[in-house]
Amino acid sequence: MGRSNEQDLLSTEIVNRGIEPSGPNAGSPTFSVRVRRRLPDFLQSVNLKYVKLGYHYLINHAVYLATIPVLVLVFSAEVGSLSREEIWKKLWDYDLATVIGFFGVFVLTACVYFMSRPRSVYLIDFACYKPSDEHKVTKEEFIELARKSGKFDEETLGFKKRILQASGIGDETYVPRSISSSENITTMKEGREEASTVIFGALDELFEKTRVKPKDVGVLVVNCSIFNPTPSLSAMVINHYKMRGNILSYNLGGMGCSAGIIAIDLARDMLQSNPNSYAVVVSTEMVGYNWYVGSDKSMVIPNCFFRMGCSAVMLSNRRRDFRHAKYRLEHIVRTHKAADDRSFRSVYQEEDEQGFKGLKISRDLMEVGGEALKTNITTLGPLVLPFSEQLLFFAALLRRTFSPAAKTSTTTSFSTSATAKTNGIKSSSSDLSKPYIPDYKLAFEHFCFHAASKVVLEELQKNLGLSEENMEASRMTLHRFGNTSSSGIWYELAYMEAKESVRRGDRVWQIAFGSGFKCNSVVWKAMRKVKKPTRNNPWVDCINRYPVPL
């Protein structure tokens, strides 16, 4: 059983090493077998520089909160032992200039603090577009639409069918019907038509829910990775809703499925420098424009997973919105691994040998994704984990650092653990080399993981030690809507709201990853109990059927 579990995480690759130059096998071709993990145990190795980075963020935010209690304690200790008469006597002993100067410095310091501290950013509400039923397809209908287009041979269609059966995607996802066309659908006209449908659908719902007029929006950020026309999608939104001329608009492209959190981060920065403003963030992807019509299996995979979807989020930094906001933005941590060549090319848009454009998925994707995820959660940990978990983590880290047994076991970690598991023996040296895995359930009540695929979600659950309930929103979103790219984490939050599981004070962790390779996290805190929606929620008509087994 132990060996089976170990092998499940491994993949093999035959590497051609060329012609043997010397020895008994001179002149013969040689090969080697490289063994890789599907998704590395990213919590089994910790880079201290990312732990340090997390504490750097924490100190930057908490320096004032740590200083003020100390000053209050010192002042209380000095004044607490004096009677009222003694206090007045001491004040009378000082001249007027000293007293005025002291209070002047105090007031100035308080003003500088309140003026320089980051403004709170609130999430007023959000909307997720639900396409019409004419776009709904089952897995069998999806294959038939692809066959009807006449662009795929039976071998490619069979490969698509096998991928879909193991994907975790259900029979009610949405695709543009144009994928069945024998003509070229990756045109600007087709892309604009799909973009206007999903973006305006989400924004109409958002403006209805928040009762904010489009002209009152001061910041607009639109992210779409593949489809980037001129004029931009943000300009298309401004034109459609006749927004004001001095709006700060941004259009993010080519940043993959994690771009939604990047857009939130950009909107937050804009709100810090523009008081009393609303910001709208739109996240989407165009399925038809990204449709690949070749036979390269590594480029066919995105066709099987990506589905129609769009989210629109209303943010505000106005203090009066504190009362009716749903969530407050707590933390954003971004990780970018593009400096590494393997990470940079793990998801890569290019043409195949026949000249057909598409996204190529590298065999290294799971490995580089795990590394990016490890870096991100290591940086996020000090900001969100309770002090008890941080103490246990550092105790385990010190034990691994200074224990000779841990150092020895590190060099032979794979062989030792494999042998121990095979023989059913618990290895003490392996225990020393294994770091303490923090319990993230103590830091968050709700988890929204990017629903990339069933396998990815299973690996995340295992490595983070999460329960089925923690993963429910991500799995059900994958089943009902498929991979909607950067908007997927909002469909997951909408699922939680439809289940009435979000209560005042709850912390929500959204995490997404995409090309580059990037992994980004955002943490929200619920400002109030979110009531079950009766309309304007993509889950309203089907929430009673969920969860379902995958």
From Swiss-Prot:
Name of this protein: 3-ketoacyl-CoA synthase 10
Q: What does a knockout show?
A: In additions to several malformations due to organ fusion, plants lacking FDH demonstrate an enhanced cell wall permeability, reduced trichome formation, and are female sterile.
Q: What is its EC number?
A: 2.3.1.199
GO cellular component annotations, sorted alphabetically?
A: endoplasmic reticulum; endoplasmic reticulum membrane; peroxisome
Q: In which pathway does it act?
A: Lipid metabolism; fatty acid biosynthesis
| Expression triggers | Repressed by herbicides such as flufenacet and benfuresate. Down-regulated by darkness and low temperature, and up-regulated by salt and osmotic stress.
Keyword annotations for this protein, in alphabetical order, are: Acyltransferase, Endoplasmic reticulum, Membrane, Transferase, Transmembrane, Transmembrane helix
**Domain FAE, first and last residues per copy:** 113-402
What InterPro entries would the database entry show?
3-ktacl-CoA_syn (IPR012392), ACP_syn_III_C (IPR013747), FAE1_typ3_polyketide_synth (IPR013601), Thiolase-like (IPR016039)
According to its UniProt record, where is this protein located?
Endoplasmic reticulum membrane
Functional description taken from the UniProt entry: Contributes to cuticular wax and suberin biosynthesis. Prevents the postgenital fusion of epiderm cells in organs in contact, as well as ectopic pollen hydration and germination. Required during ovules formation. May regulate an epidermis-specific developmental program during gynoecial ontogeny.
Catalytic reactions on record: a very-long-chain acyl-CoA + malonyl-CoA + H(+) = a very-long-chain 3-oxoacyl-CoA + CO2 + CoA
Q: How does it sit in the membrane?
A: Multi-pass membrane protein
The record's principal subcellular location, in a coarse class, is: endoplasmic reticulum
Which range is the signal sequence, renumbered to this chain? none
Question: In terms of domain of life, where is this protein from?
Answer: Eukaryota
The UniProt record's further free-text remark is: Called 'FIDDLEHEAD' because of the shape of mutants, in which adhering floral buds cause curling of inflorescence, resulting in structures reminiscent of fern fiddlehead.
Task: Please provide, alphabetically and separated by semicolons, the GO molecular function terms listed in this UniProt record.
Answer: fatty acid elongase activity
Q: Indicate the family of this protein.
A: Belongs to the thiolase-like superfamily. Chalcone/stilbene synthases family.
Catalytic site: C257, H336, H446, H450, H479, N483
Which Pfam families does the record associate with it?
ACP_syn_III_C, FAE1_CUT1_RppA
